[in-house]
Amino acid sequence: VIIAMLFALMMIAKLFSIPTGFADLRISFTYVFFALIAMMYGPMTGLIIGLCSDTLGFFIFPNGASFFFPYTIQAAISGLIYGLCLYKKEVKLSNIFFTRLLINMIMNVIWGSLCFGWLYGYDFATTCAYMLTYSLPKNLLWLIPQTAVLYICLKAFTPIVKRFSN
């Protein structure tokens, strides 16, 4: 029941992203619920939630883009990373920073850029240019704010996590 409620909140949070004026750069708090689920129930649950949220999100909130399964893999592995880094661990700023660093750099910058290049048929040089000039700066810019928000939220939810996690 708790997973379903948090998953529903995660899906609702997808509706409330704030555009920044750049192409796909939006401020969203979906990752907070994603991390909370993985922190409470572990890496496999995080992986499954990633698969479900990306797939259901595509059908519930269509944005005109094509469904592209490698992005679903990105969401699933991100959930796995959240679970591996946060499950049954004390909420510490260094741990949250490391988790976000892994997700931002490996999943968002590297995997996300490769998916972007593959989806749009870009050659490797163009994909690398996108990675270095757009994806890397964007993810570095948001690393500290995402870490801070995630730390504050997970710290606030720690008593609930201790009560309801398995």
PLM-predicted stretches and their roles:
Residues 1-166:
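Loop-helix junctions at membrane interfaces
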